[in-house]
């Protein structure tokens, strides 16, 4: 096993990994877009079953609907008094484009890409039930702002039914928090008992917006639904799956969500409640819904009751999301190597806490990872050197046994045993290192902290490609130099040509990779060159040849 062959193996494994991810990525279908009016809403009917019939989408009476804005230090929400839905969510701490002032818009009521968070009360007496239609709430103000010195801002909206039952819907925004409280207070001033059921759902256009489609050379981030239940910590539920079969699951606690790269919106019911999860693709429209229904609530005449829920609408911040609901942090999807990627992300965060630069933190993490793997690297090159020393004896065996493959294999095994050489010793370390690299790949790809994070000089955003392609070119040059300094006994012309083009192929691939990932690979190559130089000197002192 020569280092060139190992480089080929790394390249093939890595390219295969990317191709597999691209093949497995859940891409949404692309039907013709449908223009949708902002007043259209889909609301579930009450009950504990999974049936979700469509109900009235009209507001009560002829009262004029209004849009109310509420802002904290990290969120700006727009609320529609018809139904009390969140029809817009601006993430004030995250800009749409690097260097610009316009905030990133996660929720929007724009017809070309509708994405809203809806909630209400259905049931026998629910204001959003089929018999009632959607209510139009009243609010004292049209604008609410978290003031200096305040920890939270509350937006109360009220509606009173024909029997005198007062429904107050409150939105609670806390300082520095992307979890929005959505609560109902029910004051039954009527002479009859009232029964209601809370629902919360996310409604989104299925077709992927152009700004989320990514590049063909980079594995696409998942966009679609997801949920967590008692027996399933984290499960994606794609738009295609919603088309094939509606989600119908009853569970204690849990959450339902819509995911995209870096950001997520998720309804988190009370952990002690038994909730019903559902999904639906609206017939004839390019829209999908995922949501939940809470247990029925009975309010006796003259009594009061309160129903609470949480809506996360923001970036994928693992530490904060874990406090909102169990396993909500798993929406930062590291794939099947999550158990490696999570510690790597934690280390990256720790390093950033010291240096306050994500690029430098990546370099520090690379140094640590390659340092830990140094014994494997040394074992790899030592095994390669021992195999090289056996080349004359292996050539003699080939000459001795000719085309007799059975005797040739037997002779080689006896030689390896006698010389205490593991023929796979140069390959196994590579196979051990690949899962670490793949996990680190996803740790960097999924980290919202790297979005718009500067490094140095021209690298102002580690989450996108190098605008001048300097890092990919340097990475390719370092790979070429590493290849040149490595010994070779490859005589097959095809393998030689493949080896010559490997740095070019990798350079081309990395032109579109995030600068943070390219930085990791470049630093890793430089470390490999340094380690290889040190190891070769040590081996030569022991009489093991490192050059052919």
Swiss-Prot record:
Which GO BP terms apply?
A: protein insertion into membrane; protein transport
Classify the protein's membrane topology as the record does.
Multi-pass membrane protein
Identify the main location.
membrane
List the Pfam families hit by this protein, alphabetically. 60KD_IMP, YidC_periplas
Source domain of life: Bacteria
The yes or no answer to whether the keyword Hydrolase is present is no
**Transmembrane ranges?**
6-26, 357-377, 424-444, 455-475, 503-523
Its family remark reads: Belongs to the OXA1/ALB3/YidC family. Type 1 subfamily.
Could you identify this protein by its name?
Answer: Membrane protein insertase YidC
Taxonomic placement: Bacteria, Pseudomonadati, Pseudomonadota, Gammaproteobacteria, Aeromonadales
């Amino acid at each position: 096993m020569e280092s060139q062959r190992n480089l080929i193996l790394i390249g093939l494994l890595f390219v295969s990994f990317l191709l597999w991810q691209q093949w497995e990525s859940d891409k949404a279908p692309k039907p013709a877009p449908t223009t949708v009016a902002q007043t259209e809403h889909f609301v579930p009917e009450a009950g504990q079953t999974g049936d979700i019939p469509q109900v009235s989408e009209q507001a009560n009476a002829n009262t004029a609907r209004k849009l109310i804005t509420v802002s904290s230090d990290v969120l700006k929400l727009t609320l529609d008094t018809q139904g009390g839905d969140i029809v817009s969510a601006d993430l004030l701490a995250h800009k749409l484009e690097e260097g610009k002032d316009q905030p990133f818009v996660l929720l929007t009521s724009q017809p070309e890409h509708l994405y809203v968070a809806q909630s209400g009360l259905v049931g026998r007496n629910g204001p959003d039930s089929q018999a009632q239609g959607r209510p139009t709430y009243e609010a004292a103000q049209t604008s609410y702002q978290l003031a200096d010195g305040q920890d939270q801002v509350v937006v109360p909206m009220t509606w009173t039914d024909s029997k005198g039952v007062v429904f107050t819907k409150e939105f609670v925004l806390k300082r520095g928090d992307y979890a929005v409280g959505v609560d109902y207070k029910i004051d039954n001033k009527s002479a009859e008992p009232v029964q209601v059921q809370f629902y919360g759902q996310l409604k989104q256009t299925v077709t992927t917006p152009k700004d989320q489609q990514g590049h063909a050379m980079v594995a696409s981030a998942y966009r679609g639904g997801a949920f967590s239940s008692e027996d399933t910590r984290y499960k994606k539920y794609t738009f295609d799956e919603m088309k094939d079969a509606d989600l119908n699951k009853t569970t204690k606690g849990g959450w339902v969500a819509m995911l995209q790269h870096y950001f997520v919106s998720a309804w988190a019911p009370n952990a002690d409640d038994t909730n019903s999860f559902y999904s639906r693709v609206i017939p004839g429209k390019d829209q999908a819904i995922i949501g939940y229904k809470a247990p029925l609530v009975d309010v006796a005449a003259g009594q009061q009751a309160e129903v609470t829920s949480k809506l996360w609408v923001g970036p994928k911040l693992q530490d904060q999301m874990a406090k909102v609901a169990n396993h909500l942090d798993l929406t930062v999807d590291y794939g099947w190597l999550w158990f490696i990627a999570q510690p790597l992300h934690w280390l990256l965060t720790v390093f950033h806490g010291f240096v306050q630069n994500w690029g430098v933190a990546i370099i520090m993490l690379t140094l640590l990872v390659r340092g830990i793997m140094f014994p494997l690297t040394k074992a790899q090159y030592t095994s390669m050197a021992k195999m090289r020393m056996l080349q004359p004896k292996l050539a003699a065996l080939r000459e001795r046994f000719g085309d007799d493959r059975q005797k040739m294999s037997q002779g080689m095994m006896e030689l390896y045993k006698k010389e205490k050489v593991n023929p796979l010793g140069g390959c196994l370390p590579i196979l051990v290192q690949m899962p670490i690299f793949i996990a680190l790949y996803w740790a960097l790809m999924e980290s919202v902290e790297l979005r718009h994070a500067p490094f140095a000089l021209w690298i102002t955003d580690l989450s996108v490609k190098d605008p001048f392609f300097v890092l990919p070119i340097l990475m390719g040059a370092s790979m070429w130099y590493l290849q040149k300094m490595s010994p070779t006994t490859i005589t097959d012309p095809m393998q030689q040509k493949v080896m010559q083009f490997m740095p070019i192929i990798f350079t081309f691939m990395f032109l579109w990779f995030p600068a943070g990932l390219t930085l990791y690979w470049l630093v890793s190559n430089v470390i490999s060159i340094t380690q290889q130089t040190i190891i070769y000197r040590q081996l030569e002192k022991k009489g093991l040849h490192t050059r052919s």
